[in-house]
Amino acid sequence: MIIVKLGGSVITDKSEYRAFRKDVTARLAREIGSSGKDVIVVHGAGSFGHIVAKENHLQDGLSEEGQIPAAARTMCDTRELSSMVVEEFLAAGIPAVSVPPGSCFVMEDGKLIVGNEETIRRLEGLGIMPVMFGDVVADRGRGFGIVSGDQCMSAKDRKSVV
């Protein structure tokens, strides 16, 4: 199994809020599909995650109630981006589905803790490519935190410590 990272600055224009680079993503999906390899895709949040998260200091965890709507907006936006990425893989003939990190991972005081990866393993077993992404996730100590696409990649094969 190969894990491929699609950088957020590659699939979005990070200078413009929610600017998806459909043509670039479609080309990457075709190239990944033509490789014939079993792949898990992890993508960055780009302009769908970084702008609102940075403006509201979400990376520091919950410090004021006003951050909650921003955390929810960021989660909604990153899921929308992931859906767009998945659509490009489907258009390229690759069965793919978005797997939000919050469904597999939890953080504790800013540190990623690997949780239940059964969903990912079962999708792989069915021949469906999991697509994960950087996102806001629950944090046991801070309320919420930011998990990056890179953290998803490095955590993929670690054993659970939950």
Where does each model-flagged region fall?
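N-terminal glycine-/serine-/threonine-rich phosphate-binding loop
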Residues: 1-40
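Short beta-strand segments
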Residues: 3-7, 42-43, 99-100, 131-133
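Short, active-site-adjacent cap segments at secondary-structure transitions
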Residues: 10-12, 46-51, 104-107, 137-139
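Glycine-rich loop at the start of a catalytic domain that most often binds anionic cofactors/ligands
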Residues: 17, 46-62
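Charged helix-capping and loop-helix junction motifs
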Residues: 19-26, 113-118, 145-153
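Ligand-binding beta-strand-loop-alpha-helix segment within the catalytic cores
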Residues: 57-136
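Conserved mixed alpha/beta catalytic, RNA-binding, or beta-rich assembly cores of soluble enzyme
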Residues: 129-131, 136-140, 144-157
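Conserved small/polar residues in nucleotide/adenosyl-binding loops
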Residues: 159-162
